[in-house]
Design a protein with these regions (language model features):
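Peripheral docking tails and interdomain loops at the edges
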Residues: 6-7, 338-385
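A charged, amphipathic alpha-helical module
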Residues: 2-33, 147, 151-277
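Glycine-rich, highly charged phosphate/nucleotide-binding loops
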Residues: 71-89, 298-313
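Acidic/His-rich segments in extracytoplasmic proteins that coordinate ligands and/or metal ions
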Residues: 82-159
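Metallocofactor- and cofactor-centric catalytic cores in central/energy metabolism, strongly enriched
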Residues: 15-24, 36-40, 44-45, 64-67, ...
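Proline-aspartate-enriched helix->loop->beta-strand connector
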Residues: 315, 319-325
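Redox- and metal-dependent alpha/beta enzyme cores, enriched for Fe-S-associated oxidoreductases
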Residues: 39-59, 241-316
């Protein structure tokens, strides 16, 4: 798609976000190999080096089947139910393979369920599966362990696509490094004294980039970043930093910004800024292993002190005025983090609020109640979320 302005590039990326399954299906129909990805631990660099599009799967509160809930059990993060609903419903049959990272209990249970269903019910047309189990301890044995796991993943990807990763790894590492750099620049457009993007739009751009090959996403992102100075400044709303469960759809952001008038200036979750925290130092499996081992601390895999320190630093960096935790039911890890996060930001005089055990669809009224006296002035008057 030829776009000539930052606004046009932004519109195109938002269109992709709202139609991700259809967009990726169209790429598959054009002959592109597509690998589904669950979780943030799967290196996009390896998928692209194998000649495929990395499509990070996501859910939505409107896409939940009774069958998926029965298969996985009710006491599991509903994101896994939604992803399984899509697989069982046949809407992801264009995938050439599916890599599930063991970054949460829900992801692990999803993998086991899919593997068993693929074995017992071949008519389901469930794609080939692979489980990626990376560790995040800051030790050399961890790096060596992770390097072996990435080597196995590279072999699996090559067998699925027919293209070994070795020849394309240097180019893919460079492309994904530029992608992360540009996405960090985009994320910064909601911060600073003159924000020009809402957190909602940043979330959508990041989500779109997780569904596009870099040869498609990079030109759009370059245009957006290069022309951002021409975008209109937003009125200043109360600056909210979001923690808790990763938001794989935009309804919480829309409620905070369009309904309550806040501005989401950052988040420590892996559908947002945390997904951009891996810095790969070379075009080899060892460098990838170290980068993904050391990426920003996720709730399910990092220590409480490291999470709290990361959150506090990002709250300071974004000049946030309140820390808001939104934690889904059956996603326990982020709730354990919150007391330490609350104490860390309180040392800087930043108030905090927590919404725990939330349904997959969080209501604006509940967000308003959680914020309490931390009311927001309208940030989106005359502008889209």
């Amino acid at each position: 798609v030829d776009v000539t302005t930052a606004a046009a590039a932004l519109d195109r990326l938002e269109q992709v976000y709202s139609s991700r399954p259809g967009t990726v299906r169209a790429l598959a129909e054009q002959g592109r190999r597509v690998i589904g990805v669950v979780g943030a631990d799967v290196p996009v660099e390896l998928v692209e080096a194998a000649g495929a599009v990395a499509y990070r799967l996501h859910g939505h509160p409107d896409v939940l089947s009774a069958e998926a809930q029965e298969v996985l059990g009710a006491s599991l993060d509903p994101v896994a139910h939604s992803v399984l609903t899509q697989v069982l419903g046949g809407s992801l049959t264009f995938l050439d393979g599916l890599v599930v990272s063991r970054d949460s209990q829900a992801s692990l249970q999803l993998f086991y369920a899919l593997r068993e269903l693929r074995r017992l019910e071949p008519h389901r047309a469930i794609p080939p599966l692979h489980l990626l189990d990376l560790l995040h301890l800051p030790t050399e044995p961890t790096a060596r362990y992770d390097e072996v796991r990435l080597g196995r993943l590279a072999d699996v990807l090559g067998s699925w696509t027919g293209q070994p990763v070795t020849a394309g790894l240097t180019a893919s590492v460079a492309a994904v490094a530029e992608l992360r750099h540009l996405l960090r620049e985009v994320s910064d457009l909601r911060r600073g004294p003159r924000p020009v993007l809402t957190g909602t739009r940043v979330l959508r751009v990041l989500g779109a980039a997780a569904a596009l090959p870099t040869d498609v996403s990079l030109p759009l992102l370059r245009r957006l970043v290069d022309g951002a100075g021409a975008l209109p400044a937003l009125p200043q709303g109360r600056r909210v930093y979001l923690t808790g469960s990763a938001q794989d759809h935009d309804e919480v952001y829309v409620a905070l910004e369009a309904a309550l008038g806040c501005l989401v200036v950052g988040e420590d979750t892996d559908w947002g800024d945390l997904a951009l925290s891996a810095d790969v130092g070379g075009a080899d499996l060892g460098a990838l292993a170290r980068a993904y081992r050391d990426r920003g601390p996720a709730a399910a895999t990092a220590s409480l002190p490291r999470r709290a320190a990361w959150t506090a630093e990002q709250v300071r960096r974004s000049a946030a005025e309140v820390l808001l935790g939104v934690v889904r039911e059956h996603d326990e890890a982020p709730a354990w983090d919150f007391p330490a996060q609350r104490a860390a930001v309180a040392a800087d005089g930043v108030p905090s609020a927590l919404l725990a055990r939330q349904p997959y669809r969080v209501l604006a009224t509940d967000l308003r109640s959680a914020l309490g006296s931390a009311t927001c002035e309208p940030v989106l008057s005359g502008a889209r979320a």
